Swiss-Prot record:
It is found in: Cell inner membrane. PANTHER family: MANGANESE EFFLUX PUMP MNTP-RELATED. The keyword Cytoplasm does not apply. Probably functions as a manganese efflux pump. This is Putative manganese efflux pump MntP. It comes from Rhodopseudomonas palustris (strain BisA53). One of its GO terms (cellular component) is plasma membrane. One of its GO terms (molecular function) is manganese ion transmembrane transporter activity.
Length: 194
């Protein structure tokens, strides 16, 4: 993957955590130290989950070489579509999945794990295209750390509206990234231009 694609993927994967952090920041009104701690928890978990998915994907990669780009496209489209759907749902439905209002460690960890499940699915897809998972996982983790920290601080002042917009943009970016992988691996663009 190109550095630009890695940056887009990292930002896209961090938007769930950002949205949860804005929600949590709006309800908990954290200080800078609390926001940094939460960012660290989210970043570490978000970096680990694509590694888990990638490991599982490697096991299956040889079995599905002929359709790997379709699998990557499908997984990214499903994850992106889910993010778009959640971002456009009504506020009443969105509240059901919002970050827990309690500020204990376990609620924070549960929220971080919940927002990182999508990264595991993306990790599976990355195994099929032979991407450098270590660079990507580090980039996703760092980006999530920054976005979560900033999101919690923004949540103190702006509230939940900004978080839903970020989730929508992230979902659209993932669908676009999936389409780009499909186009590159099927040669459609080369055929059209050649």
């Amino acid at each position: 993957m190109t550095p630009g694609a890695i940056a887009i993927l990292s930002l896209s994967m961090s938007t769930d955590a950002f949205a949860a952090a804005v929600s949590r920041g709006a309800s908990h009104r954290p200080g800078v130290v609390s926001a940094v701690k939460a960012g660290f928890v989210f970043g570490v978990i978000e970096a680990i989950t694509p590694l888990i998915g990638w490991s599982l994907g490697l096991v299956a990669a040889d079995l599905v070489k002929e359709v790997d780009h379709w699998i990557a496209f499908g997984l990214l489209t499903i994850v992106g579509g889910k993010m778009i759907w959640e971002a456009t749902r009504s506020q009443d439905h969105h509240e059901e999945g919002a970050a827990p209002k309690r500020s204990n460690r376990w609620a924070l960890i549960a929220t971080a794990v919940g927002t990182s499940i999508d990264a595991a699915a993306v990790g599976v897809g990355l195994a099929f295209i032979g991407a450098n998972i270590w660079v990507i996982a580090a980039s996703i983790g760092f980006t999530t750390f920054v976005c979560t920290t900033v999101g919690m601080l923004i949540g103190k002042t702006v509230g939940q509206r900004f978080g839903k917009m970020a989730e929508l943009i992230g979902g659209l970016a993932l669908v676009g990234l999936g389409a780009m992988i499909l186009i590159q691996h099927t040669g459609v663009l080369k055929t059209q231009l050649g």
